Amino acid sequence: MKLDLEGRIALVTGSSQGIGAAIAAGLARAGAMVGVNGRDAERLDKGIEQLRAEVPDGRFVAIAADVATEEGAARAVDALPTADILVNNLGVFEPRPALEITDDEWRRYFEINVLAAVRLTRAYLPRMMARGWGRVLYISSDSAVVIPPEMIHYGMTKTALLAVSRGFAKEAAGSGVTVNSVIAGPTHTEGVEEFVRELVGADLPWDEAQGLFMRDHRPQSLLRRLIEPEEIAHLVVYLSSPLASATTGGALRADGGYVDSVLP
């Protein structure tokens, strides 16, 4: 079984670090040329340097743009007019007491976590459909299904992505383009590590902090540990490949068994 993406062009939003960077590396290993996106040019350059160290024969191009804005999304599309694979990974999260989330915060989360993906899909999906092949993916979260009380604004956006993904899959029906979302479970990224330490204690050894977090805040996990970014990337690369040609309109889980359901 070969995940052959040779000759394909991919754009991964928010990919200078974390899950996005792992996805970019995985797609490059499978043969795709990858547009690596971030809004901070210096951080983006460092991210690409790290990716090239990980995947020496990988092909990466920097797409410096804040795709959470209308202007930034247009800049990204201008920089990479053709994409066979679009991975909408960009997202922000921060714990906030539910009744203290302001209108501006609700709008900001929707702009970054949802509208950025919608804008890019509107730009790339018609071009993919015209060519008769493409992959559009949305990185959602277990928080879309199991809404965390400390992050309901984040959970709302990730639920919205499931609806967006299913809707665009219907729009692309019969075109040769597949559209899916990935429900990622609690994942070990730099941002999540900071979040964990805020909740359980900044001075604890990491293994102990992770164990306490999973026990007290994510006890539903059957994995009983945080997922590594590469474990999310494996599913994304498969869904981006020709092997996943019959999978569309789905919300596929890489959640470590966190979502308590027998359904996918």
Question: Residues of each region from the PLM?
Answer:
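Short C-terminal tail/terminal secondary-structure segment
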Residues: 1-6, 146, 236-237, 248-264
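Short, small/polar-rich loop/turn modules that mediate ligand/substrate recognition or access, typified
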Residues: 173, 178, 247-249
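Conserved glycine-rich cofactor-binding loop
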Residues: 9, 16-17
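Active-site helix of classical SDR
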Residues: 121, 157, 165
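Substrate-binding pocket helix/loop in short-chain dehydrogenase/reductase
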Residues: 97-98, 105-110, 217
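Residue(s) in the substrate-gating loop at a strand-loop-helix junction
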Residues: 141
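Alpha-helical segment proximal to the catalytic Tyr-Lys
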Residues: 126, 170-171
